[in-house]
Amino acid sequence: MAKNTFQFLEVGRVDPKKLDAAERVKRSGEIYGNFDKEGAADQSERCLECGNPYCEWKCPVHNYIPNWLKLVSEGNLEQAAELAHQTNTLPEICGRVCPQDRLCEGACTLNDGFGAVTIGSVEKYITDTALDQGWRPDMSKVVATGKRVAVIGAGPAGLGCADVLVRNGVQAVVYDKNPEVGGLLTFGIPEFKLEKNVVKRRRDVLEGMGVEFVLNTDIGTDIKFEQLLEEYDAVFLGMGTYTYMKGGFPGEDKDGVYEALPYLVANNKQQLELDSPDYVDLAGQKVIVLGGGDTAMDCNRTAIRQGADSVQCAYRRDEENMPGSRREVNNAREEGVEFLWNRQPIEVVGNGKVEGIKVVTTELGEPDERGRRSPQAVPGSEEIIDADAVVIAFGFRPSPAPWFSDYGVDIDDGGRVVAPEEASEGTCAFQTTNPKIFAGGDMVRGSDLVVTAVWEGRQAAEGILDYLAV
């Protein structure tokens, strides 16, 4: 049957059904439903199959988006799944957590005037459905090379690296200090965005491909790094960034001020029925979350589900210039979060414990060299907003392991591991200053998206294959 070139005129953009806010705040699970076969095909057929698909370029892993949309529209699900996995280790996860409005869907030709193709939801449908029907990556033609690589960190970068290695006949052994794989996918991102059985299923898939996981193991404590260098042909570092960025204003040390990541991690661990001594319950409290990224939205929506009396989110720029996903802001707003735009915190106030936060109104100045407009304080605009708890979500900075320098792994002034993504004469992609050690993800580029970490892990694996000459 010939493609209907004007499908996008006859069929508008349709997203999977979303639970009503009043219902979803009472539960911890994902809020979006799934496409069925017909719905996914109808939405996929809206794709114009552009000659130079900007959506593909805008995607950090450069997914073959028009190609697998076409396969879905034709009912070729397994081929679509195989194609999706050629570029992405975690397509069903990226389909859930990527800010598609800033990436592929934001670049879709139909986005202006007709509504972008629902790329993320179709991506999720492809892998969820294929895996549920028994599809698995075809490893039948892989020939073992006898080479072994240790991967430190079972987050997106480490999983991406291990995936590419085993597909090329290299044994990948992934070490992680946590009791389950996924890194922040499991312990940072809340269940309402990513249910943990999805990550566990991906672990099963990777183990079926030959990836070995060694969990509850802290490198440098439980196993010396030197041992890995002796036992393996190469080592990949994908340990992420976990140290929060402080605001640098008075009162950050008061009782009732919480860091975003420990707050989220402890909440996830409690839901997973794991030991969570740092668990904080904000039920009945007036909460202010500081920040405008996706982590801030996760904190906002978690506090709502815990039963906070009120949740306000203060961000120093306006809504148009916030870094987070528009979808997540809308979800938070629907669930009862109040946004305080152009408010910059200058002090946490209270007698020993949080009683409020002093903010100043801002105006945006001229764009800097990166194109971002800097907030400027408006004189005389200070005000105090009542609060019982403050959650700081200003992002994360690298926290390099103390043993890096012992093994010739250089870091830059910002604490990031030096591992250039481009190969040069005598070096391989994502190779550190120790030729046997590679690195990728947030610890190289700084805190970023899941999908960028996947891409760097996969590219680092290609660099390792070059280094091993396999």
Located regions from the model:
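Local cysteine-cluster metal-coordination motifs and their immediate loop/turn environment
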Residues: 45-64, 89-112
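Glycine-/small-residue-rich beta->alpha transition segments that form the dinucleotide
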Residues: 234, 238-245, 293, 387-401
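FAD-site-proximal beta/loop scaffold in flavoenzymes
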Residues: 255-284, 367-447
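A conserved FAD-binding loop/helix module that cradles the flavin
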Residues: 299, 443-470
